[in-house]
From Swiss-Prot:
Organism for this UniProt entry: Vicugna pacos
Modified residues (Phosphoserine): 12
Gene: RPL34
Polar residues bias locations: 16-28
Record-stated family: Belongs to the eukaryotic ribosomal protein eL34 family.
Subunit: Component of the large ribosomal subunit.
Residue segments, region Disordered: 16-35
Name of the protein in question: Large ribosomal subunit protein eL34
Disulfide-bonded cysteines: none
UniProt cross-link Glycyl lysine isopeptide (Lys-Gly) (interchain with G-Cter in SUMO2), position: 108
Taxonomy of the source species: Eukaryota, Metazoa, Chordata, Craniata, Vertebrata
Presence of the UniProt keyword Cytoplasm in the record: yes
Length: 117
């Protein structure tokens, strides 16, 4: 005969969100109590590069909700959503773009002064 399973929560169907594991206890002959399994935690990926961020703990979203803000992110620009290397690269790229804009402006001014003479 098939073993009867007893769910502890309201959801009584074998779905992906209702994963359980059997718990054998003495005296439980006709039914087996089940323990609910927690969800697998995934590390937080960066939005540019699929790599793990230098962020706080790697845990379930329910646990993250209970943590304070200081434990969920790193105290720097883009802390918690980008790693330090990507932030450095972003700052360098922005600086070089601004430098290029200035160079173009200076070259235009020189060309106009040459035309005027």
């Amino acid at each position: 005969m098939v073993q009867r399973l007893t769910y502890r929560r309201r959801l009584s169907y074998n779905t992906a969100s209702n994963k359980t594991r059997l718990s054998r206890t003495p005296g439980q002959q006709d039914r087996l109590p089940l323990h609910q399994e927690g969800r697998e935690s995934t590390y937080i990926r960066m939005w540019r590069v699929p790599r793990q961020t230098a962020r706080g703990p790697c845990c379930e979203t329910q646990v993250l909700m209970r943590l304070s803000k200081t434990k969920k992110h790193v105290s720097r620009a883009y802390g918690g959503s980008m790693c330090a290397k990507c932030v450095r690269d972003r700052i360098k790229r922005a600086f070089l773009i601004e430098e290029q804009k200035i160079v173009v402006k200076v070259l235009k001014a020189q060309a106009q002064s040459q035309k005027a003479k």
